[in-house]
Amino acid sequence: MWTVQNRESLGLLSFPVMVAMVCCAHSSNEPSNMSYVKETVDRLLKGYDIRLRPDFGGPPVDVGMRIDVASIDMVSEVNMDYTLTMYFQQSWKDKRLSYSGIPLNLTLDNRVADQLWVPDTYFLNDKKSFVHGVTVKNRMIRLHPDGTVLYGLRITTTAACMMDLRRYPLDEQNCTLEIESYGYTTDDIEFYWNGGEGAVTGVNKIELPQFSIVDYKMVSKKVEFTTGAYPRLSLSFRLKRNIGYFILQTYMPSTLITILSWVSFWINYDASAARVALGITTVLTMTTISTHLRETLPKIPYVKAIDIYLMGCFVFVFLALLEYAFVNYIFFGKGPQKKGASKQDQSANEKNKLEMNKVQVDAHGNILLSTLEIRNETSGSEVLTGVSDPKATMYSYDSASIQYRKPLSSREGFGRGLDRHGVPGKGRIRRRASQLKVKIPDLTDVNSIDKWSRMFFPITFSLFNVVYWLYYVH
């Protein structure tokens, strides 16, 4: 009984040991062990000529490109460029690197890439680029059994982006990344987007502080140079600028400063210190805003949209200051002098009228006329020449330049009566004509100038804003 139980327990314990021995024997014969892989890599690199492309003398090598965009770090209007960090992958087939016996892909150390042929790819519009090197150089080389090579890099590049800033900051920009072969022509190498529309990834995850990526487009083409035709791939980003920052930093302050300059129209015109200080402060503030904006933009020859708005605000602020200069000139300057002179002329005329109303009579009862009265009477007699009698002469000459008025005849009385009846008719016509005239503000009245400015400036500025935003906002 004991013997049978010992045999059964011994059989149960020996079964796992036998399975382990079989597995060890199988693993010792596995061709993917370290020694076999080492021999395979040594065999692939032995006699490999890095100077010759795959299928040298045969058809061109097809190189597929894939880009995973990690971030767009900066878009600079001053330097006309943008900075892009990406995972850049290239794949091609090299029959010299095909192997068998190992059903696995071989991911090798990045230093092996220096011993293999790789495409001479470069970025056409590159200004400054580098491959990240922390903690080691960020390169990947992976071999497939059929000889396909996958070569990956983590690159940060600063690429040129020519911008049209005529509609800045209500603009859209198109920034591209141009990928091209430097030395190999289309007879030796061809580029294509590996994966079609899915060759570029990560764009939808990018968030920029001043831009929104509206769309991106991939293009494959050939370019002709004197040395031949070269393959080129283009990745273009359509960037739309976010207006929120500029509304808060530029448009709203400029608008409020312009409105603030109109406060002077409600300040009394004799408060020179207050109105001048307010006008100069608003002008200097607008100048500061414009100067700060120009420092953040390149020196370009054309006018930008924001320049037009700031210039319009500056003109309104400056005109508000000039309006007080005009009011001050009317109130304290030449205007009062003209008013004083007109008052003196009016008093002189009234004095002359009083003197003319004084009647002088000689000893014979004749009325004495002065030289001014003679002229007035003469002009009146010329008008009534047609109805007067040549025999009824109203004046007689005296060497003392004093004239004697004789009694009027019936015809003279008729003429004077006609003249008296004609004057009221002319007065009625003049009154009716004055009623038809449009009321025009008196520019010599300082209160009227300020009153009209309170309406003119806001209405004109509102029309300016309506035209501006309708034109520049799509």
UniProtKB/Swiss-Prot annotation:
One of its GO terms (cellular component) is Schaffer collateral - CA1 synapse. It is a multi-pass membrane protein. Keywords: Cell membrane, Chloride, Chloride channel, Disulfide bond, Glycoprotein, Ion channel, Ion transport, Ligand-gated ion channel, Membrane, Postsynaptic cell membrane, Receptor, Signal, Synapse, Transmembrane, Transmembrane helix, Transport. GO terms for biological process: cellular response to histamine; central nervous system neuron development; chloride transmembrane transport; chloride transport; gamma-aminobutyric acid signaling pathway; monoatomic ion transport; ovulation cycle; response to progesterone. Residues 1-25 form the signal peptide. Residues 26-245 are extracellular. It is found in: Postsynaptic cell membrane; Cell membrane. Glycans are attached at residues 33, 105, 174. Beta subunit of the heteropentameric ligand-gated chloride channel gated by gamma-aminobutyric acid (GABA), a major inhibitory neurotransmitter in the brain. GABA-gated chloride channels, also named GABA(A) receptors (GABAAR), consist of five subunits arranged around a central pore and contain GABA active binding site(s) located at the alpha and beta subunit interface(s). When activated by GABA, GABAARs selectively allow the flow of chloride anions across the cell membrane down their electrochemical gradient. This is Gamma-aminobutyric acid receptor subunit beta-1. It comes from Rattus norvegicus (Rat). The gene is Gabrb1.
